[in-house]
């Protein structure tokens, strides 16, 4: 198992490097073929390589990704290493160890009939070319297990995830010479400053959950009393954050245009819809200015109800395997589990590696946890297929 992990970590797979992704897909496909006994279907969409294995009529979907956030060449500065039971390297936690655990778990089953495995190559950038594949597979499945890393260093699984929305607010003004006749212009930069404050005000209003929105933010509960928590900087609250701001063309011109990027995170679909209404209700503050508000993408939330039954089953199995009480937590980040849950497929996320530091220089995996996590997944799949 450790040798397999090393082979994947050494094969870099930056999301933006399609050639590297093709090499990674070949490595992951070879590993899966060796352990599952059959080669995957290679699906290339807009240059991005995804892998799919289908055994019989699928009832259980396993989801992972082979791309990472690490630019090609990162391995030189952050080489593969194992010291004192800790494995390090680019993407080791997010999520190459999860892929290794998944393949070994499936290899231990008596039969793979009813299993579908989908490993995409663009999760880290929002799954733009693979989302349809994931949702199509999820619609026909009784359960989806997502091999993202555990929710904490103790191996908690992820029972809820915030949804995300990205907006671009474009401010249209009118250009003029800043020295000769500035009064003839409509300053888009000044209007944008007003809008940034208005957007921040929406964020402050919704940060308390129900607050002034009338939409409960949630508490991070999973529907399984006593075993759940929230993490990730208020995983049960909505956030609205202006993130990027640009305006103008030259230093001596009244800006005719400005742009504001807005990041939205929500625990429920109702909150997502309500914040959409609030943002689309923004109005210009300066005469002559005009606003254009666009939702440019995102993912729906994975709400607690999507995972409740699977979490209860996983908890029972963990106890039977002597792995102690299994915790479920709600987290602020998104994954492809958001998409499987959104189409009505019961989903349990965070079944991958135990460690910490995803996307960070200190990313690591606890090697000793890999076999127990693989056993937990194997039993989950077996019982779900019954």
What do the predicted segments below correspond to?
Residues 63-64, 118-120, 145-148, 170-172, ...:
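Short beta-strand segments
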Residues 95-162, 208, 212-214, 223-233, ...:
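Acidic/histidine-rich catalytic neighborhood of metal-dependent amide-processing enzymes
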Residues 61, 87, 94, 142-146, ...:
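Short glycine-aspartate micro-motif
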Residues 41-45, 127-128, 240-245:
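Short gly/ser/thr-rich secondary-structure transition/capping motifs
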Residues 59-119, 125, 139, 361, ...:
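Active-site metal-coordination/substrate-binding segment of hydrolases
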Residues 1-90, 111, 384:
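Acidic/His- and Gly-rich active-site-bordering loop/insert found
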Residues 13, 70, 149-154, 159, ...:
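Metal-dependent amide/peptide-bond hydrolase catalytic core
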């Amino acid at each position: 198992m450790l040798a397999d992990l090393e082979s994947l970590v050494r094969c870099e797979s930056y999301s933006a490097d399609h050639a590297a992704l093709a090499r990674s897909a070949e490595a992951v496909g070879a590993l899966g073929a060796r352990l599952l006994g059959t080669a995957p279907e290679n699906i290339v969409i807009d240059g991005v390589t995804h892998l799919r294995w289908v055994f019989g009529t699928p009832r259980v979907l396993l989801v992972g990704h082979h791309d990472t956030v690490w630019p090609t060449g990162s391995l030189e500065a952050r080489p593969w290493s194992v010291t004192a039971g800790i494995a390090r390297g680019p993407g080791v936690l997010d999520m190459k160890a999860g892929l290794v655990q998944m393949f070994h778990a499936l290899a231990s089953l008596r039969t793979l009939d009813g299993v579908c495995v989908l490993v995409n190559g663009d999760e880290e950038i929002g799954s733009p070319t693979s989302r349809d594949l994931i949702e199509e597979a999820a619609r026909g499945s009784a359960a989806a297990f997502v091999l993202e890393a555990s929710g904490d260093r103790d191996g908690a699984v992820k029972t809820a995830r915030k949804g995300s929305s990205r907006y671009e607010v474009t401010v249209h003004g009118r250009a003029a010479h800043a020295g000769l006749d500035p009064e003839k212009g409509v300053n888009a930069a000044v209007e944008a400053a007003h809008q940034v404050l208005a957007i921040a005000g929406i964020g402050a209003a919704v940060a308390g959950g129900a607050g002034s929105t009338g939409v409960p933010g949630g508490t991070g509960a999973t529907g399984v009393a006593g075993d759940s928590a929230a993490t990730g900087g208020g995983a049960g609250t909505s956030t609205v954050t202006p993130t990027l701001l640009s305006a103008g063309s030259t230093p001596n011109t009244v800006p005719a245009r400005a742009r504001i990027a807005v990041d939205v995170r929500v625990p429920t679909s109702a909150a997502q819809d309500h914040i959409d209404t609030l943002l689309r209700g923004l109005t210009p503050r300066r005469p002559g200015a005009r606003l254009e508000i666009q939702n440019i993408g995102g993912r729906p939330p994975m709400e607690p109800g999507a995972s409740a039954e699977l979490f209860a089953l996983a908890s029972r199995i963990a106890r039977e395997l002597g792995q102690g009480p299994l915790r479920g937590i709600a987290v602020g980040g998104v994954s492809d589990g958001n998409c499987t849950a959104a189409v009505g497929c019961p989903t349990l996320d965070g079944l991958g590696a135990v460690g910490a530091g995803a996307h960070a220089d200190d990313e690591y995996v606890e090697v000793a946890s890999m076999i127990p996590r693989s056993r937990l997944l194997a039993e989950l799949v077996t019982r779900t297929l019954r």
